[in-house]
Curated annotation (Swiss-Prot):
The gene is SDE5. Keywords: Plant defense, RNA-mediated gene silencing. GO terms for cellular component: cytoplasmic ribonucleoprotein granule; cytosol. The keyword Chloroplast does not apply. This is Putative nuclear RNA export factor SDE5. GO terms for biological process: defense response; ta-siRNA processing.
Length: 490
């Protein structure tokens, strides 16, 4: 050190080594500094870079030890950065010498804060914004606490146990197969409560609750009716629910945009309607008016024709129809109430099963089965009542479905010939339901006309009914095959 200090004013190498020693003396020995200086071919800047690189590789524990707590200001020289070839055109700011204190602070945090960073004015390239995936973001403590609270009280069970429990709970009266139950459980993540709600929504009992048609009764009424399997429809509803929401959302946005454009175009190209004043009526005063014959009118004329009041006699079947309708509504109300109670019990059973309360879950399932059976019985009663009403209404008819034939002015043979002609014309036509034969008043030929007509109908095996005490005969012609009539032309 004495040699370097004595010759610092004469030898440039000694001055360079003195600068390096003052800068890196706390990190390296004199031999290391001299070796780096020789390696850099007596270039102070390159030697400073070599020593800086070596200082970054050394462990930080060597920086904690300090020789003295007090410090005196020294001149620190930070070497300039060698510019790269690709940034040769950019302007580089060279650092200046800063007078700082090397004391206890620098021994703890290092001397890197004394080294200034080069600032480049090189143009920056445009880059795309960073895409952040929500799955990569770590969960916060609040999320973890909420998840911990939501998972409290739930016991993880094997998928087979969950599937067996749901099959047992929904087995009686449930139309879906076990494969559908397995797939719905997979979609819902084997959550007992969600799977139960989804399967109850897809069940046939819930589907026909508001319509009043059950599978058992419909199979008795219409044996040719083939019930289509709803398993594929259920799975399509589950898989396409998200896609349907997306499609409807985009369609609504597109319709709103088209409507806005249409309103703008109409406002631009449609002008206001032209206002036209009504012609003023000019009155001429002082002119003579022709004389008016007759008397002046003081009140409006009276209508000599009085309004005819038609009193409609209420049918005797009205009260019976009202009773049937009230009974049908009562059955439908009972079906809805029993189904709601069954669903509540099934939901409570699913929640108890997820918490590990197996015995309580089975008791709730039994109660749900009881109310489900009650709902099916009420459903069957309502459907039976509806079928009885339809069968009674089948005998009724509209006036446009009836063809009336008046036999009052005809003799027995002429009436019989006219009836045969009408039966040939109107038989087998669905738009004409009945043929009304009016025999007229009970005169001398009334019995003979009725005798010939009844004999013809019985001979052709045609059903008929009487009305108004035998004065009217109703024949159901839409069910008659005209080819089977014996008097029809071959």
């Amino acid at each position: 050190m004495s040699k370097i200090a004595s010759s610092s004013n004469s030898d440039p190498d000694s001055r360079s080594l003195q600068v390096l020693l003052d800068t890196f003396g706390s990190r390296f020995s004199l031999d290391d500094i001299a070796a780096a200086y020789c390696q850099a071919s007596q270039n102070v800047d390159v030697a400073g870079e070599i020593l800086s690189a070596m200082a970054e590789k050394t462990p930080q524990c060597d920086q904690v030890e300090m020789k003295t707590a007090t410090s005196k200001p020294t001149q620190v020289y930070v070497p300039k950065e060698v510019p790269r070839q690709e940034d040769s055109k950019a302007k580089v700011w060279r650092p200046k010498r800063n007078s700082i204190s090397n004391g206890t602070v620098s021994s703890v945090i290092g001397k890197e804060y004394a080294r200034t960073r080069p600032i480049s004015n090189a143009p920056k390239e445009a880059t795309k914004p960073l895409k952040i995936n929500s799955r990569d973001i770590p969960e916060t403590e609040i999320w973890s606490e909420e998840m911990r609270k939501s998972n409290e009280g739930k016991i993880s069970r094997a998928p087979t146990d969950v599937e067996e429990f749901i099959v047992k709970m929904l087995g009686e009266g449930f139309q879906a197969s076990q494969e559908v139950i397995h797939q719905v459980l997979g979609v819902c993540g084997y959550d007992v409560k969600k799977s139960t709600e989804k399967l109850l929504d897809f069940s046939d009992t819930k589907k026909y609750a508001d319509v009043g048609i059950s599978n058992e009764v419909m199979s008795k009424v219409d044996p040719q009716r083939q019930s289509t399997s709803c398993n594929q429809m259920e799975l399509q509803k589950i898989s396409q629910s998200v896609g349907a929401r997306t499609f409807t959302g985009s369609q609504e946005g597109r319709n709103a945009k088209n409507g806005l454009e249409k309103e703008v175009l109409e406002a631009l190209f449609s002008g206001a309607e032209r206002y036209v004043d009504k012609p003023k009526v000019t009155r001429h005063f002082g002119e003579r008016r022709p004389g008016v014959a007759g008397r002046p009118v003081f009140k409006p004329l009276e209508d000599p024709f009085q309004e005819r009041v038609v009193a409609v006699k209420q049918s005797s079947n009205t009260s019976k129809e009202d009773d049937d309708e009230n009974e049908f509504k009562a059955h439908r109300k009972a079906v809805r109430e029993h189904l709601n109670q069954m669903k509540e019990y099934y939901g409570a059973a699913a929640e108890a099963f997820s918490k590990g309360e197996t015995e309580r879950a089975h008791r709730l399932v039994e109660k749900g089965h009881f109310f489900g059976q009650k709902a099916r019985e009420a459903d069957d009663k309502s459907v039976a009542k509806m079928i009885d009403v339809n069968q009674e209404d089948d005998s009724t008819y509209e006036e446009d479905e009836v063809v009336t034939v008046n036999m009052n002015e005809h003799e027995a043979k002429e009436a019989l010939r006219l009836l045969k002609r009408q039966l040939i014309y109107f038989s087998g036509i669905s738009s004409f339901k009945y043929l009304r034969v009016q025999l007229g008043e009970k005169k001398e030929d009334f019995k003979s006309k009725r005798k010939h007509i009844v004999k013809l109908l019985e001979g052709e095996s045609i059903p008929w009914t009487e009305e108004d005490g035998g004065l009217v005969i109703m024949i159901r012609v839409d069910e008659i095959d005209p080819k089977k009539l014996s008097f029809a032309k071959k």
